[in-house]
């Protein structure tokens, strides 16, 4: 997400916060945009095989994929290019992607279908509700959160998805030995992520320093490449569930 998009998110949030009827804090602003014909066609033709409808029922991953394999779950996959590349490069794993942006879901399905990816399923819904209602405890091998909205302004920090209660929820969803992998290009958010993870006695940092080098399995995005060329930093965090 660009700085301009981040600013737009914050402006939208300022407006939303004025409404007293808002029942809960959300970590995202849902901007649907225009669905292209290609994206809509992908949803119409591929949803039955690659899409998962939201329901208050735990997913049976073995039945869903027709096999038993490590589950990698990613929240906020955007247009899905990195997620598809990871799924292609790790056919021995099963991937679940959660995204609230409809056109992004359509783009992901279209690209995954063209690439012949079969070990990927997507959910178009609020990730927090999906985690609470659909993801079994102790079921995930890896949880991925790449470049979430940093909510720059201090008064919006409460909207950041990475909070102590969120990490505690992820502790339940990850199996012992499972890994949380986060990445951000916003240093203040990286420091926030690090502080929240370090405060949990149930996780340990897999890196000898605070932040880890980008692992080879996380593809570079166009945005990240552009930032690297401009000298902008990117911070990866990998923490393992130990209890």
Swiss-Prot record:
Residues noted as binding substrate in the record, renumbered to the chain: 153, 185, 221-224
Catalytic activity: guanosine(46) in tRNA + S-adenosyl-L-methionine = N(7)-methylguanosine(46) in tRNA + S-adenosyl-L-homocysteine
Positions that bind S-adenosyl-L-methionine: 74, 99, 126, 149
SUPFAM superfamilies (UniProt xref): S-adenosyl-L-methionine-dependent methyltransferases
Keyword terms, alphabetized: Methyltransferase, S-adenosyl-L-methionine, Transferase, tRNA processing
Classification via Pfam families: Methyltransf_4
Top-level taxon of origin: Bacteria
Protein's UniProt name: tRNA (guanine-N(7)-)-methyltransferase
Source organism of the structure: Psychromonas ingrahamii (strain DSM 17664 / CCUG 51855 / 37)
